[in-house]
Amino acid sequence: MAVAECPVPMTHGADIRADSTWFSRTQRTPDVLIEFERFDGTDRGQKKLDEKLCNLLEASMRWGDAPSVLILSAWNKGVVSAPNKEVFVQRCRQGFKSSVGAQVPPLRNTAVLFSRFIFEIECSGTLLLKQMRCERLL
């Protein structure tokens, strides 16, 4: 069962809502958390993706590390440079301190996937999905 913009438990003050949360019907806990973000190939775009990853990591912690899979999904129109995935891997392996001072630990038993959707703008102005890529970061 999936929920969009699902709030995570409030344990450290900041409101976090995963873009998509997939729940186990039997356990009634989240199995998969997903964040989506447009990526424009800039440093600012890289920072936005990192912020989305931090949301995933903190949301997982707040759910008691229940999710078995976290997915960071980036999409773009046209050709842009690829994001630096090593930054994401290090964030997952090292953890971080949240904006409210909560320590988010490194991931232990959670898979992290990075997916990309590359769209092309057609002459009619519509978008056409040209490529999809998905790889496991952890």
State each model region's role.
Residues M1-R28:
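Active-site metal-binding core of divalent-cation-utilizing nuclease and nuclease-like domains
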Residues S20, I34, L70, V112-F114:
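Hydrophobic beta-strand residues in large extracellular and virion-surface proteins
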Residues S20-W22, P30-D40, L56:
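Conserved catalytic cores of phosphodiester-cleaving nucleases, focusing on short active-site segments
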Residues S24-Q27, S60-A66, F96-P105:
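Alpha-helix termini
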Residues D31, S68, S124:
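Conserved acidic residues
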Residues F39-G95:
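Catalytic cores of nucleic-acid endonucleases
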Residues L72-L138:
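Domain-level recognition of nuclease-like catalytic cores that cleave nucleotide substrates
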